[in-house]
């Protein structure tokens, strides 16, 4: 069965934000790609790096690796960080490891990591 682009677009438009985030994650894993625009700049940085001596990374991705033993404080922290509702934040936390924020500054990434680690979560910055 072949789906038309319009049918796929209509199906996606009826999905919740959480379902769309999970779909994007599944597509990234299946095809080995990333939806982050920072990867385009990463390719440009590699080209520039080969021409110059050193390029410093300026955009970072914050990844919730695991929630630890205390799920409720982690859900509250994720809600405040992402602005999601309770159910969406809970679903997101339970699907760890998951990307929480992309293309953030080093300071913001460190602050998010400290916040999440203070409530028992394991966080990775890439």
From Swiss-Prot:
CDD domains: Ribosomal_L7_L12 (cd00387). One of its GO terms (cellular component) is cytosolic large ribosomal subunit. The keyword Ribonucleoprotein applies. Keywords: Ribonucleoprotein, Ribosomal protein. GO terms for biological process: translation. One of its GO terms (molecular function) is mRNA binding. Disulfide bonds: none annotated. It comes from the Bacteria. Forms part of the ribosomal stalk which helps the ribosome interact with GTP-bound translation factors. Is thus essential for accurate translation. Belongs to the bacterial ribosomal protein bL12 family. Homodimer. Part of the ribosomal stalk of the 50S ribosomal subunit. Forms a multimeric L10(L12)X complex, where L10 forms an elongated spine to which 2 to 4 L12 dimers bind in a sequential fashion. Binds GTP-bound translation factors. This is Large ribosomal subunit protein bL12. It comes from Blochmanniella floridana. The gene is rplL.
């Amino acid at each position: 069965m072949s789906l038309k682009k319009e049918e796929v677009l209509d199906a996606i438009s009826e999905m919740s934000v959480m379902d769309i985030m999970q779909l994007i994650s599944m597509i990234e894993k299946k095809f080995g790609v990333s939806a982050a625009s920072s990867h385009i700049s990463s390719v440009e940085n590699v080209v520039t790096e080969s021409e110059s001596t050193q390029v410093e990374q300026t955009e970072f991705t914050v990844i919730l690796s695991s929630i630890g033993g205390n799920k409720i404080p982690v859900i509250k922290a994720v809600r405040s960080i992402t602005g999601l509702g309770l159910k969406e934040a809970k679903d997101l936390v339970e699907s760890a490891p998951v990307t929480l924020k992309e293309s953030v500054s080093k300071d913001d990434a460190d602050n998010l990591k400290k916040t999440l680690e203070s409530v028992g979560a394991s966080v990775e910055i890439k």
